[in-house]
């Protein structure tokens, strides 16, 4: 038995376990004030409002997904309008979207990712700039310029994130992967390369691994293969193989163990199917269910139990819709009606603050 008081130290031996009778206070601070990353280190994060521990690869949050659950939809278009709107829903409760704020400009064919606190949107089209905007998800308001751009300007890029790092991948005529550290602004750095140039793609994460959907490259047909990366370490993507077929325009979401590919088109025909893939095994995606309407390039987000797929395009250029589907991610089956977006919109993108790439136990 060892009694621990204020400023007490142990000069030899080790403590295999510690029972605290009254109070135990770990180090605390913001994300930027985390202690040295040693396996087993504990920390209370003021940004995420939860206990974290370092598992040897990354900081993991403990049981904080239930305190969040907001999904955002960024921009998009409906002939002839180009939208700057940011709308949101609370995933746990059904209903229509509400206005959150606005991007720095009207845009379509961008993509976005989020951690527990920030949502980030990249690429403005048709201005075709590599601009990055961000918002604080818990509080509404207009987007703020990130302070750095993608290293390449490419619409229809893929996007995915863990709790600390966000990834933009590919896009029109490029295979470049960029990353940002989400807790700090003004950074965007080369990460590596996809196995081939991909556009009209999306991505999802587990707490360690990112998967980028097949996509295509104009004017050629869609790719059959999919890539994956280890988000915590820079480097080129690794080819998985043909796991979903030749599909562009899918929207992705994930639990902590599986990723989902929703909708898309091949070739030029919109699809309603939802497929599920176990992220750790990187095996073929299996049929999970169907959207209520075949479409592509909508906005997706999820919490631990439910995903939403908002709006999308049934046929280009004048086939945008305003429906929102709800998907139970624990059981296979078709979607149910969730509500409606404020207007018909396609070539949009979505994020949530409680997806499977953020950990949580």
Task: Please describe what each predicted stretch is.
Residues 1-361:
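Polar, enzyme-active/binding microenvironments
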């Amino acid at each position: 038995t060892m009694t621990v008081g204020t400023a007490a130290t142990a000069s030899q031996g080790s403590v295999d376990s510690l029972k605290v009778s009254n109070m135990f206070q770990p180090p605390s601070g913001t994300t930027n004030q985390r202690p040295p990353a040693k396996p087993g280190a504990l920390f209370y994060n003021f940004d995420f409002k939860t206990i974290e521990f370092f598992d040897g690869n990354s900081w993991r949050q403990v049981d904080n997904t239930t305190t969040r659950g907001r999904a955002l939809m960024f921009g998009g278009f409906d002939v002839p309008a180009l939208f700057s709107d940011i709308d949101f829903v609370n995933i746990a409760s059904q209903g229509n979207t509400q206005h959150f704020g606005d991007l720095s400009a009207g845009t379509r064919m961008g993509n976005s990712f989020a951690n527990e606190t920030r949502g980030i949107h990249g690429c403005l089209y048709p201005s075709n700039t590599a601009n990055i905007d961000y918002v604080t998800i818990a509080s509404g308001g207009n987007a703020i310029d990130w302070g750095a751009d993608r290293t390449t300007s490419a619409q229809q890029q893929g996007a995915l994130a863990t709790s600390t790092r966000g990834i933009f991948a590919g896009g029109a005529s490029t295979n470049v992967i960029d990353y940002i550290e989400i807790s700090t602004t003004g950074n965007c750095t080369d990460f590596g390369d996809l196995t081939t140039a991909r556009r009209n793609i999306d991505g999802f994460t587990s707490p360690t691994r990112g998967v980028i959907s097949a996509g295509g490259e104009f004017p050629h047909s869609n790719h059959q293969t999919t890539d994956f990366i280890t988000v915590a370490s820079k480097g080129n993507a690794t080819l998985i193989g043909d796991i979903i077929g030749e599909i562009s325009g899918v929207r992705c979401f994930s639990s902590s163990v599986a990723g989902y590919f929703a909708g898309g088109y091949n070739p030029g025909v919109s699809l309603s199917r939802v497929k599920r893939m176990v992220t750790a095994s990187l095996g073929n995606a299996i049929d999970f269910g169907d959207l209520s309407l075949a479409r592509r390039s909508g906005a997706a987000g999820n919490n631990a139990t439910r995903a939403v797929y908002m709006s999308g395009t049934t046929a280009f250029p004048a086939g945008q819709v305003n429906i929102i589907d709800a998907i139970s991610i624990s059981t296979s089956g078709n979607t149910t009606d969730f509500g409606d977006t404020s207007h018909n919109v396609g070539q949009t993108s979505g994020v949530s603050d409680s997806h499977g790439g953020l950990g949580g136990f």
